Regions:
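Short glycine- and acidic-residue-rich catalytic loops of nucleotidyl-transferase/cyclase enzymes
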Residues: 1-4
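Alpha-helical transmembrane segments
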Residues: 6, 10-13, 17-168
Length: 168
């Protein structure tokens, strides 16, 4: 999970649109924070989650469109590894699939597409541009702001569903 989380975020999977990876990471971390508080698992690490989220907020504030800084692999790898560590410390590793669903889908579909093509010679995703945010920008006509906002809404809805499932 640690490697998968890091790989889905890095290497231009979700860091190609200004603010997308940072916004989705903040939503994911806040979901983990809430779930940690509900499950009462790891109170001490919650401060680290909040600190990381605040640092990302500062980055997003400074780097609002048009971006001034390129996050690069160093930042996106750090976000992926931190999400993986936070989820593992929560002792509910399968929650990762819900709280980071958009990051997984955005980065993971490219891995699925390449794997299907290379190993099984299946061209089922031939007309899909990966990562997904590039597909909706180029074929759907979405602007960068629309991509960030709509992907964030999708992740918030999925995260709220995960929180609700834990509460019942």
């Amino acid at each position: 999970r640690l490697v998968g989380s890091e790989m889905c975020i890095r290497d231009s999977c979700s860091d190609g649109v200004d603010g997308l990876s940072g916004t989705l990471t903040i939503i994911t971390l806040m979901s983990v924070f809430v779930l940690d508080n509900i499950l009462k698992v790891n109170d001490s690490f919650n401060y680290c989650i909040l600190l990381f989220a605040v640092c990302l907020l500062g980055y997003l504030w400074y780097n609002a469109t048009p971006s001034k800084l390129l996050m690069g692999d160093a930042g996106s790898r750090a976000m992926g590894i931190f999400i993986a560590i936070a989820v593992l410390k929560m002792h509910s590793p399968f929650m990762y699939l819900l709280v980071a669903a958009v990051l997984i889908a955005d980065g993971g579909l490219g891995l699925v597409k390449v794997s299907l093509l290379r190993f099984l010679k299946i061209h089922i995703l031939k007309n899909t541009i990966t990562p997904i945010h590039d597909h909706v920008r180029k074929k759907g006509g979405w602007s960068n702001a629309q991509v960030v906002f709509r992907f964030a809404i999708i992740q918030i809805v999925i995260s709220l569903a995960a929180i609700y499932l834990v509460m019942i």
